[in-house]
Amino acid sequence: MELNDKKVLVVGLAKTGVACARFLASRGARVTVTDMRDEAALAGQLALLEGRGIRRELTRHDAGTFTQSHLIVVSPGVPRTLPQLVMAHEAGVEIISEIELASRFIQAPLVAITGTNGKTTATTITGDIFIKNGFRTFVGGNIGNPLIELLESAEPVERVVAEISSFQLEWIRAFRPAVAALLNLSEDHLDRYASYREYIEAKLRIFENQTADDYAVVNADDELVMEHSRGLRACLFPFSRKQELDEGIFHREGLIVWRHNGREERFPTAGFRLQGVHNLENIMAALACSLLLECRPTESLACVREFEALHHRMEFVRELNGVRWYEDSKATNVGSVEKALESFDAITLIAGGKDKGGSYSPLSRLVRERVRHLVLIGEAAGRMQEELGTLTDTRRAATLEEAVSLAAELTAPGGTVLMSPACSSFDMFRDYEERAQRYIAAVKAL
């Protein structure tokens, strides 16, 4: 891809936008960056662009800048419906995402992992397995470092593992992973997409450019995933914790069994540090992605056994008076809360926050069967109570700290208190990490 002397516009100056601008400038492009924030708000980002001849267009998006560019690179947080992007698209300007730009230069085999939930855990495990097997590996994408930073560093690698969001897939054209994984599908980001269907279609683009030489790792237990996997050009490689597979990877009686091209490997799950049924799926997906690209079973099993839960994903906080407390602040949608509820019994569930637009009714069965007490907080509390409040003992709390105190009073020894919000955090907190820290502090103060 020739960039020298091309007029390239980078839209959005978060971490990804800054990395793209630096890379493009290093390749001789005439780069302009645009962001609706002002210079004071962007001081840190702008300092990273100093001395590179990059033009700035702040507090506005000029239509002429968009339509007169040769190429536009869009940051993930920028919606497709931005009027200036629509105008540029109609004018025939090539518009791509950062992952599309990076993939045009990456030479190593690329593993791309998406899904509504579990992406970060599965991506991190996959990267760790490659490293344990001796491959020089870059792990990034929607977590950690943008893919484009690998190119800017010019560090030689043998494997690339990327967590990919639906936002990043919106502007791909030739993005083609050697292995693409779709972990699951459930309602999310309906504040961004016009419909659930539109969200699903964005996710499915991860397979769009694959051929029969590539692999599609898919969840055989997810009806939506399997429905949309029919007709994929890539070689289908399913994983399941519910059914035995002739070709794929599945769980049976304490073993993960891998079957591929007549070969079988067995991985005992005893001793795994990572707990929860959803994490069993993440582990199988990670093993599939890595074993399909030449990792060895012994080293891979050793890596999986040692892996511990990432922060804010069903993380154990403490045990007090016979009650175990867990923090799952990253569970910002219904699908992730379903997986958490499947992992415990006798639960006091703390949920709520900023409503993202989906229905909470898919939680009904698990709330009825497993949740003894439901404590609701935040903007979504009213609607959650309407949909779930008749299924179990339900209370409201004005603050997270009040919710923790109430949960401590309600939960009998042998029970579990789980904060798994099913909502984003922005009504009460800066982000999900601040929500987690406040919860942990309140629990430890009991």
Curated annotation (Swiss-Prot):
GO terms for biological process: cell division; cell wall organization; peptidoglycan biosynthetic process; regulation of cell shape. InterPro entries: Mur-like_cat_sf, Mur_ligase_C, Mur_ligase_C_dom_sf, Mur_ligase_cen, MurD. Disulfide bonds: none annotated. Signal peptide: none annotated. Keywords: ATP-binding, Cell cycle, Cell division, Cell shape, Cell wall biogenesis/degradation, Cytoplasm, Ligase, Nucleotide-binding, Peptidoglycan synthesis. GO terms for molecular function: ATP binding; UDP-N-acetylmuramoylalanine-D-glutamate ligase activity. It catalyses: UDP-N-acetyl-alpha-D-muramoyl-L-alanine + D-glutamate + ATP = UDP-N-acetyl-alpha-D-muramoyl-L-alanyl-D-glutamate + ADP + phosphate + H(+). It is an enzyme of class 6 (ligase). Pfam families: Mur_ligase_C (PF02875), Mur_ligase_M (PF08245), MurD-like_N (PF21799). ATP binds at G115, T116, N117, G118, K119, T120, T121. It is found in: Cytoplasm. It comes from the Bacteria. One of its GO terms (cellular component) is cytoplasm. Its EC number is 6.3.2.9. Pathway: Cell wall biogenesis; peptidoglycan biosynthesis. Cell wall formation. Catalyzes the addition of glutamate to the nucleotide precursor UDP-N-acetylmuramoyl-L-alanine (UMA). Belongs to the MurCDEF family. NCBIfam families: murD. This is UDP-N-acetylmuramoylalanine--D-glutamate ligase. The gene is murD.
